[in-house]
Amino acid sequence: MGLFLPTTKKELELRGWDYVDVILFSGDAYVDHPSFGVAVIGRTLEAAGYRVAIVPQPDWHGDYRDFTKLGRPRLFFGISPGCMDSMVNKYTAARRLRSEDAYSPDGRHDKRPEYPTIVYTKILKQLYPDVPVILGGIEASLRRLTHYDYWQDRLRPSILVDSGADMITYGMGEKVTLELARRIAEGENISDITDLPQTVFLTKTDAIPGGITDRDIVLHSHQECLRSKRAEAENYRHIEEQSNMMHAQRLIQETLPQPLPLREKGKYPQEGISTKEVSSPLPYRERLGESLYVVVNPPYPPLTTEELDASFDLPYTRLPHPKYKGHRIPAYDMIRHSVNIHRGCFGGCAFCTISAHQGKFVVCRSKESILKEVRQVTQMDDFRGYLSDLGGPSANMYGMKGRNQKACEKCRRPSCIHPLICPNLNTSHQALLDIYRAVDALPGVKKSFIGSGVRYDLLLYRGNDEAANRSAEEYTRELICHHVSGRLKVAPEHTSDRVLMLMRKPPFRQFQQFKRIFDRINREEGLRQQIIPYFISSHPGCREEDMAELAALTKDMDFQLEQVQDFTPTPMTIATETWYTGLDPYTLQPVSSAHTPQEKLAQRQYFFWYKPEERPALERSLRRIGRADLIPRLFGTQPHNSQPSHYSHPSHDNYRADPRPQKPGKEKRGRNRRHP
């Protein structure tokens, strides 16, 4: 394991450096671990011979000394908001400030501004106007084109316009960042680098490289999208398809830099610097009012196993920087003893951003690389023999890909398993079983748990490959018997097949089938494990009647739900575009959604049917929607004699709105704790 990348002038001097090639600014605390993107990019550049420094969570107030303490980099500044979109990280679905920031020391939520991508860029461009600023990370990736911002309740243009940065490197950034650094180091001007895959830049119409050709997809302009929600919906279909193609086309969208309207005081969260300052384009970029075009170059092909191994095999310390000694970083606590074994997800869930950021093609690490990292974990002072997770974006997609790759190269489907599992997909779980067994055989490993989400539709699928079918059965039993820490969490998300179709999730009967298998194996093996389902309310297409049925069905299955959340519209998902536009981007048919707090609360209340204090409001709601027949099914035949009470919003403040995973095996406490 190597030293930490330098974060201060003193640390530069200890290395004998009198300059730095690249300075990375991050909205997260600096944790030198392959699950933290800034550490990955920093180590990747370091391995290529560049001098790299990191400034984690700079103070954006006052004299900006954190932005000047390391001086001017030789090549460029890189900016990442952190592992999550800053607004998802900071606010709940109800636009309330979260109680803690999991990626900050001691969970403090005052260590990063809103939209750090914008705030950091503007400060750096003010201080160093001639130094390129490159945006990376999920916030910039998912805001690379016109997008709906839930927290401001309006369409925003590409974050390049709002920030004044020079370029976005979207998606997983190792390869593109290395190539960009090489070209700038060789003397190319950032404004001349317009052909680099997986980058986004702004240009005038007469400067679009090669001009607009038949190979390009020209999207509706930002101004058209402001006028027409249909235009925005039509755009998104192209964006999603191209994000999931092996050989994508270039996307071009006209945009118009202009000051954006001031928000009403107190109506929405306030950004770290003034709204006027954030929203106005910078004068160095182009004069106000001149039309510019956002150009999104197609991505690189997926990494090879060898390239992915190289990224994970870099000399990470796997620890928070020593500056945080005595402070707890909650997100690190969750992953300190976990190992990521693949990237990408072909699930294509409507509310998920993974395919837009990592793509649908699964890239796997080699067994040797995985075992090497597990051995490192076993040497950690606080390791007691239990790995918290061997997984990835999904627990059981390791080693899966299309049998005929030529067919995959032409495919436009955003999901390989919805609405039906593609017959070309190799669904064998054998490679994953081999990984589990090899890990569990290592000295020092007592047990490896699976904390990532399990796709039970892949476990239930029976195709023409009998070996793959047998491996799914074998995996199911091994998972339940040896890799569950008492509670297996899965995500049916809803019970209505109509809503599930919009979510791109399998029918609810598959969850019921999987639960029967889970219960049977528990009986056969003498286990007393629980299956914990996740559910979402207020997803586009979901009606109050659907939530009433959800309450009745889950009650019949003896669940008292705890892992629940309200749908949060986040940039660049089909669910968000449907929620905002009211249209399905693929069919352009209308889809209704719950928008107001009252409409959302009316749906969310059904999660908590088992709480006596909620019964009066639920009975009134069931009668109002014409489903009084569900009252005896939920509450029995005994009438409720208490006086009607006004339904109180704070009674649901503790529902699970946080999309971040909990530590595997951790018992939920408080009002949503499952009763024995």
Per-segment meaning from a language model:
Residues 24, 40, 54, 60, ...:
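Conserved SAM/AdoMet-binding glycine-rich loop
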Residues 61, 191-214, 222-244, 300-303, ...:
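Terminal amphipathic helices with adjacent charged low-complexity linkers/tails
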Residues 85-94, 142-144, 174-179, 361, ...:
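Flexible glycine/acidic-rich beta-alpha junction loops that bind and position SAM and/or redox cofactors
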